[in-house]
Amino acid sequence: MTPLEIALKEYGNESFAGLPTNPDVLKYFTETGATFVHDDETPWCAAFMNWVFKQANIETPNKLLARSYENFGHPTVLQKLGDVAIFWRVTPESGLGHVGFFIRETDKLIYVLGGNEDSAVKIKPFPKTQLIGFVTY
């Protein structure tokens, strides 16, 4: 299966506010070596991507930072369905970000399938103005 197909099988998994912790979200951390994370309240977009790529036997930076995907794969400006989209949060210089699988785009928005999209695995739009770039693998 492709990484996008694996990610789609997880569609709808969500973290719970407070307790209990959803084991289907916690596995994104524990099965990729982040055993120090014990709840689903920790930001998990990068953990989700790490887990998906691990299932596809594709090596990633395996860090819990979305922007670590800037150093993954090959940069592309000809993005296709399933490529990785990387965004900044707060400010471009903050080091904070978001990462997900490219689905489609409009004039102003990029739609990605990712983890921790409003606390769930789902498709969500992000402003093109916050795009750092796309990578293919």
Question: At which residue positions do the language-model features occur?
Answer:
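Short amphipathic beta-strand/extended segments with alternating polar/hydrophobic composition
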Residues: K122-K128
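A broad, low-specificity signal marking well-ordered, structured residues that form hydrophobic/aromatic
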Residues: L4, I110, I132
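...with weaker cross-activation on analogous glycine-rich loops/strands in unrelated enzymes
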Residues: I58-K122
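N-terminal capping segments
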Residues: M1-A56
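Short intrinsically disordered terminal tails
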Residues: M1, Q79, T136-Y137
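Low-complexity, Gly/Ser/Thr/Pro-rich intrinsically disordered linker/tail segments
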Residues: T129-Y137
